[in-house]
Amino acid sequence: VTVTTTRSDVVVVGGGPAGGTAAYELARRGLDVVVLEKEKLPRCKVCAGGLTLKTVQLLDFDLTSVYESAITRGKCTFKGRSPVVFDFGEVVGWTVMRDKFDYLILQEAATAGAQVLDGEKVRGIESQSTGAIVRTPGGEFRCSVVIGADGANGVVARSSGLRGQRRAAVALETEMEAPPDVLEARLGCVHFDFGSVPRGYGWVFPKKEVLSVGVGSFWGRATSLKASLFSLMELLGLRCDPSQVKARGHLVPLGGVDRVLHKGRVLLAGDAAGLAEPLTGEGIYYAVRSAKIAADVIYRALRHGTGDLSSYSAQINAEITRDLRYARRLAGLLYRLPRLSYRFFVTSPMGQSGMADVIYGRSSFEQLCGDLLKNAPRLLLSALR
């Protein structure tokens, strides 16, 4: 068997938003970058596909070709009832199909000079003092740095000894065909339902031709999720034939705990680093942000000839994990006491505007927690009425 050897500055394992963004940022600075994606591209990915405004602002290329629906409204219900509708009066985000969105980022990375290889399943990595070797069935890729952006069960974290104990949410989702009038009615509006999923929530995100309907549990078991999904669809009047529903499940590794995310010449980004937001499970923003931090650290390390990645973990913990710790506290309250929390948090103007500010990127979870704590007696009294 002939083993081909490829040499580069950086090998990125995984072609999702974290891997694609890191490859783009490094390639445009002149580094020699190879992306290894195990699936054939463009590949299907289970995800509600919500892009917040702050995520779009992090990416400096045009995404309009992959937008499905511009989001201007939000709706929250409790077990299908007690609706609270938000009219933002402006676009606060977009929905996308993940196969198209992820592929667009990889195409931008390729245009910037990265080599994108699909159908390349990484078997393992070997870290060395001055670099690393990434092995696939077809060959080995020698490089100065490896970025593990290969998701919740990534091989890079396992191979490098960076896979610590993590808490993960479990999500189940389907892309549901709906009549034109139903699609039209839901266009521009993201819908969240609380109380119908044990220790979690359900959602409906509009796309051009389908609705993304899903459920996620932050402390639950995957076994009950299918029943929760059908129950949610019934509650919301989304009729379907259960035998025709193709639901896909996935893990959402939650952030909010300081971790070591680098070792030698290897670092982790996105879901591989366990950086999803623990209140909603939002992962794309943190994937992109961690990838940009990774690219900065790697570029500096290679430019200075040190290969020292030690500032990466400290930066992620300070700039991302610290705030996710507050989201984790809010999630603990919201999902343990869903009915009270719905009235305390979702129906209160302070909770609404505070959460909107976090989504916009104007505020943080730390700020939101501080405001809610300061006004807790008044909000609680109002919620108990």
Question: Can you name each region flagged by the protein language model?
Answer:
Residues L53-L104:
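A conserved beta-strand/loop capping segment in the N-terminal third of enzymes
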Residues V10-V12, V33, V266:
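Conserved hydrophobic helix-helix packing surfaces used for dimerization/oligomerization
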Residues V3-G16:
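Beta1/beta-strand and adjacent pyrophosphate-binding region of the FAD-binding site
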Residues R29, E108-P242:
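Predominantly flavin-linked oxidoreductase catalytic cores and closely associated redox partners
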Residues Y24-V46:
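Glycine-rich FAD pyrophosphate-binding loop
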Residues D296-R385:
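C-terminal helical "tail/cap" subdomain of flavin- and related membrane-associated enzymes
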Residues G124, E140, R221-I298:
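FAD/FMN-dependent oxidoreductases across multiple families
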Residues G19-G20:
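N-terminal Rossmann-fold NAD(P) dinucleotide-binding loop
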